[in-house]
Amino acid sequence: MITGMTIDAGTSLAPAFMLTLNSQDITSNFSDRLISLTMTDNRGFEADQLDIELDDTDGKVELPLRGAVLTLWLGWQGSALLNKGDFTVDEIEHRGAPDILTIRARSADFRGTLNSRREESWHDTTIGELVSTIAKRNKLTASVADSLKKIPVPHIDQSQESDAVFLTRLADRNGATVSVKAGKLLFLKAGSAMTASGKPVPQMTLTRNDGDRHQFAIADRGAYTGVTAKWLHTKDPKPQKQKVTLKRKPKEKHLRALEHPKAKPVSKKTKAKKEPEAREGEYMAGEADNVLALTTVYASKAQAMRAAQAKWDKLQRGVAEFSITLALGRADLFPETPVRVSGFKRVIDEQAWLISKVTHNLNNSGFTTGLELEVKLSDVEYNAESDDE
């Protein structure tokens, strides 16, 4: 049974939850038997997961049917509980002795047609129209970031791919992230901390006193210093080769604690040349010291640029990892929330962070929240240098 928890001020806090099964409140049936409850909030098409362990030493717990829908509310007694979503039961485990029943459920939105393979070709459309079409046939509501809606998609094949896999591939090419939450198909700019309507997600501030464990690691930033992508099309009957080098130009002059050594401003004299697009060429984001070459050959220079920029940004976000377990659970935190921290090492405190994964744990020790964070990129402009070969 979950008990109260005392904090330093002497105030007694007790975690609280509410659980419904097919819209019927079953909280009272579970509360005295609850050993642990873990809810994992993922981003992208990795399904959110709910794990519940119940004491069944008297053998009176009835096994729920696979396919039943659980809805979870989570928080603290005396405060409004937050709805954490619907979960469809797909695994049941009973073990002993002592007898324990484990119920595992995953996001209801990730079952069914989204995972069915399809064969389809898309022509002369936009990301906004494409996502809306897929959302409609999966009985979802599309929500696409304004900066992505009008990106043209001249042609792309969905060959024996599920809609989930296909949309993930499309998102990777265009620096986006795709997920399904509360009946909505979200297609948003990756790492932007923006909602689909273009409004910023409010920043949260965490101090070291909020957590009881943390871990920080800096990755090998020198592994890749740039990304190249090639394109090939037939607009120009006389093939020309063109190489375009991308460099970051911060909008504000400030020192980012974890900035990639190759992600630096360039001279103001550098300007992108306006000229007819070459039939084929190569686009590079970053520097040429140690380049990651994308294997896909894109249909246009614009597509190659977006793919290279998306991959380069992803590499930049991975230069460091930071995780923290909050001693007092925060049901209001979710992936893509921007976070500032204080009380740690300078290099950690000075960096802007973005939540990539949230794990809520409820057991006899209390209610805790584990956060996994990645580097939040500042808004940047790009300068391109074109060299004809």
Swiss-Prot record:
Source taxon at top rank: Viruses
Induction comment from the UniProt entry of this chain: Expressed in the late phase of the viral replicative cycle.
Major location category of this protein: virion
Keywords on record: Late protein, Viral baseplate protein, Viral tail protein, Virion
Listed InterPro entries: Phage_Baseplate_Hub
Chain intervals for the UniProt region annotation (Disordered): 236-281
Compartment list: Virion
Listed Basic residues bias regions: 240-254, 263-272
Residue spans crossing the bilayer: none
GO cellular component, one term: virus tail, baseplate
Subunit structure: Homotrimer.
Family: Belongs to the P2likevirus baseplate hub protein family.
Function, in words: Putative baseplate hub protein.
Protein name: Probable baseplate hub protein
Name of the gene this protein is made from: D
